[in-house]
């Protein structure tokens, strides 16, 4: 009787003093401070903190997904942001990776290619188009015009996307040089400055649809939108793990042209060795606190994020912990 009473008192005491709630202190490797990815990091931090009070997700700056995937693979950070193209290259061991990385897994997707957060923007200045009678990029190739064309910085996969498209369209780097033209590597901000100063004729770089920098280019040089075409866009999308996407005719108010382009999405990756319960709980938090994620993230995320988007497949397998939660909720 005494033992039973003692046990009963112990149960009452445990009920009065419940176990401390689970908290997490995690790091997410992203890109430069400011911009879309850092805002996404803020949204993830808010969602995890709402689900597990006292938890934090620290956003660590880096040079982007090409750096984040190896960091996650080597266990230097628990989570990293990466585009579909970067993850595709990593798992295949394609340039710039020297060998395949097979120990990274997807936890959840932050945006799809269809949301057009990274869409190839391909345009020629109106003055150059009018001078040479350009209606399509094929006119530039057939006339072998000495274009000054800008793509993204070296080491940025977006530059590889742009160059691959140009080559398939008949404007390889060697061809452009033989026509008396020039290929310029620059970040998007510098591209805007160069084209506004009339030091570029054509631009070809990835950026979100109707981004302020696109609007600035439109204001300064009245560009004519160019298209990759369905065939080239499909080949480039397959090569870089993206999707063919479109700009509808008239969707940009400054040009009547529509265009076929390539869009790239982005995911959060973790090491395959991440504890299954941790992966499950992170995924659970993101789905159950999706409104917090949307409200504390970038305004564009607020328009596109859904539970189904979070569970959408990517270019590496999902982590087993994430799969377990998605299947429980009928999302996979």
How would you label these PLM feature ranges?
Residues 8-16:
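Bacterial N-terminal signal peptides
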Residues 25-51, 55-59, 117-120, 124-197, ...:
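Bilobed "Venus flytrap"/periplasmic-binding protein-like clamshell domains
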Residues 100-121, 251-260:
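A structural signal for short loop-to-beta-strand junctions that line the ligand-binding cleft
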Residues 42-46, 58-103, 189-195, 200-203, ...:
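Pocket-flanking alpha-helical
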Residues 224-281, 317-318, 325, 329:
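C-terminal lobe and pocket-closing loops
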Residues 17-21:
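Sec/Tat signal peptide C-region and signal peptidase I cleavage site
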């Amino acid at each position: 009787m005494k033992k039973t009473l003692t046990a009963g008192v112990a149960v009452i005491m445990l009920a009065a003093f419940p176990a401390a709630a689970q908290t997490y202190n995690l790091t997410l490797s992203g890109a430069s401070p400011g911009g879309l990815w850092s805002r996404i990091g803020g949204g993830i931090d808010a969602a995890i903190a709402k689900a597990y009070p006292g938890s934090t997700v620290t956003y660590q700056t880096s040079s982007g997904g090409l750096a984040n995937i190896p960091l996650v693979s080597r266990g230097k950070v628990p989570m990293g942001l990466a585009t579909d193209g970067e993850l595709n290259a990593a798992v295949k061991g394609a340039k710039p990776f020297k060998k395949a990385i097979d120990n990274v897994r997807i936890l959840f997707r932050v945006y799809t290619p269809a949301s057009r957060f990274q869409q190839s923007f391909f345009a020629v200045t109106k003055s150059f188009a009018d001078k040479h009678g350009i209606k399509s990029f094929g006119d530039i190739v057939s006339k072998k015009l000495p274009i000054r064309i800008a793509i993204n910085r070296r080491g940025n996969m977006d530059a590889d996307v742009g160059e691959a498209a140009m080559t398939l369209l008949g404007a390889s780097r060697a061809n452009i040089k033989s026509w008396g033209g020039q290929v310029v590597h620059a970040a998007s901000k510098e591209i805007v400055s160069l084209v506004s100063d009339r030091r570029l004729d054509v631009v070809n770089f990835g950026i979100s649809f109707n981004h302020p920098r696109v609007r600035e280019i439109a204001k300064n040089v009245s560009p004519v939108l160019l298209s990759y075409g369905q065939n080239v866009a499909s080949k480039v999308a397959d090569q870089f793990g993206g999707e063919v996407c479109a700009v509808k005719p008239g969707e940009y108010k400054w040009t009547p042209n529509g265009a076929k382009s390539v869009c790239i999405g982005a995911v959060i990756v973790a090491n395959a060795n991440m504890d299954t319960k941790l992966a499950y709980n992170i995924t659970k938090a993101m789905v159950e606190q999706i409104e917090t994620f949307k409200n504390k993230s970038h305004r564009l995320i607020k328009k596109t994020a859904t539970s189904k988007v979070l569970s959408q497949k990517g270019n590496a397998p999902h982590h087993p912990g994430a799969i377990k939660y998605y299947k429980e909720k009928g999302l996979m």
